Amino acid sequence: MAALTDLSFMYRWFKNCNLVGNLSEKYVFITGCDSGFGNLLAKQLVDRGMQVLAACFTEEGSQKLQRDTSYRLQTTLLDVTKSESIKAAAQWVRDKVGEQGLWALVNNAGVGLPSGPNEWLTKDDFVKVINVNLVGLIEVTLHMLPMVKRARGRVVNMSSSGGRVAVIGGGYCVSKFGVEAFSDSIRRELYYFGVKVCIIEPGNYRTAILGKENLESRMRKLWERLPQETRDSYGEDYFRIYTDKLKNIMQVAEPRVRDVINSMEHAIVSRSPRIRYNPGLDAKLLYIPLAKLPTPVTDFILSRYLPRPADSV
C-alpha cells in the first residue's frame, strides 16, 4: 500500500512539473479581474512571466491592477452581459495576440447574488445571475475560440461546487450547472483541435462574489417584498433560522484562496491539466461526495439542514 501511495505521489508530482514551454511568449485572457480570483491570478501569472490580458468591469479596478503589476499585464474594460462590450474586447485581444493566437481563456467573471429560497426570488433575480455566470461566459467563449484554436491552447471555466450539487436557491447553482454542461460539451467538440477545457469547482471561499451589503439586510429585503400569504406559509422563524444558517456558512468560508489560484494556474501552464479541479476541503469532503450519492440520500441530508416552514406537513 505504501508503494502504491508513493507511486501515486510521484505520478502527480511529474504531472504538476510537466509544464508547457515558452510561457513568457504565451497570452492569457482573464475576465473579472477587478478583485478576487481573477485579480490574484493575473498577478500570479505576471510573476511567472506570462503575457496577461486582464478584463475588468470598472475603470477603477483596471487602473489599480495596472499600477500593481508590470508591463506584462494589459487591461481592458468588459461587461460580459453586453454583446458590444464582448465584441470590442475580442477585437482588442485579437490585435494583441496576432497570428500566434490565445493560449488560455479564463472565464472567471461571476456574481452570486441574489440568492435565497427560490420562491422568494423573481425572474429578474435569476436572470441577473445567469446572464453573468453562464450566458456571458458562453458569449465570451464563442468570440475567443478561433484564437484559442489557433494556439491549440485551453479554456478554463470558473464553476463551483454548487455546479455539482445545488445547495442554495437562486440563479447561482443554476448557472454553475450550466457552466458544467457547456464546458463538458465544448471539451468533447474541441478535442480534435488540440484544445483542452478545464473546470474549476471551488468550495466555499470568502470573496467579493458574496457582495458588500450586510447579509441580514439583503435577506430582509427579499422577505419584506413577498406577498403576505407566502410569508405566512414560511413563518418568521424560518426567515430568522435560514438567515442565521447563511451567516454561519459565510463565517466559516475559507479566506485563504491560494489553492484556487494555484488550481487555475495549473490548468493554464501544465501540459496535462485536469478536467476538473476541486480546491477546498469542503469541496473534497462534502460537496463532491454529496453530488455522487444517490439523489434521495443527498435530498435527505440537505433538507435536514433547512429550517421547517410554518405550513410544513
Swiss-Prot record:
Keywords: Cytoplasm, Disease variant, Ichthyosis, NADP, Oxidoreductase, Phosphoprotein
Disease: Ichthyosis, congenital, autosomal recessive 13: A form of autosomal recessive congenital ichthyosis, a disorder of keratinization with abnormal differentiation and desquamation of the epidermis, resulting in abnormal skin scaling over the whole body. The main skin phenotypes are lamellar ichthyosis (LI) and non-bullous congenital ichthyosiform erythroderma (NCIE), although phenotypic overlap within the same patient or among patients from the same family can occur.
Gene this protein is translated from: SDR9C7
One Pfam family per UniProt: adh_short
EC number, UniProt record: 1.1.1.-
Effect of I200T: In ARCI13; decreased protein abundance
Subcellular location: Cytoplasm
Taxonomic placement: Eukaryota, Metazoa, Chordata, Craniata, Vertebrata
Residues that hold NADP(+) according to the record: 29-53
Molecular function GO terms recorded: all-trans-retinol dehydrogenase (NAD+) activity
Keyword Oxidoreductase carried by entry: yes
Catalytic activity: a N-[omega-(9R,10R)-epoxy-(13R)-hydroxy-(11E)-octadecenoyloxy]acyl-beta-D-glucosyl-(1<->1)-sphing-4E-enine + NAD(+) = a N-[omega-(9R,10R)-epoxy-13-oxo-(11E)-octadecenoyloxy]acyl-beta-D-glucosyl-(1<->1)-sphing-4E-enine + NADH + H(+); a N-[omega-(9R,10R)-epoxy-(13R)-hydroxy-(11E)-octadecenoyloxy]-acylsphing-4E-enine + NAD(+) = a N-[omega-(9R,10R)-epoxy-13-oxo-(11E)-octadecenoyloxy]-acylsphing-4E-enine + NADH + H(+)
Protein name: Short-chain dehydrogenase/reductase family 9C member 7
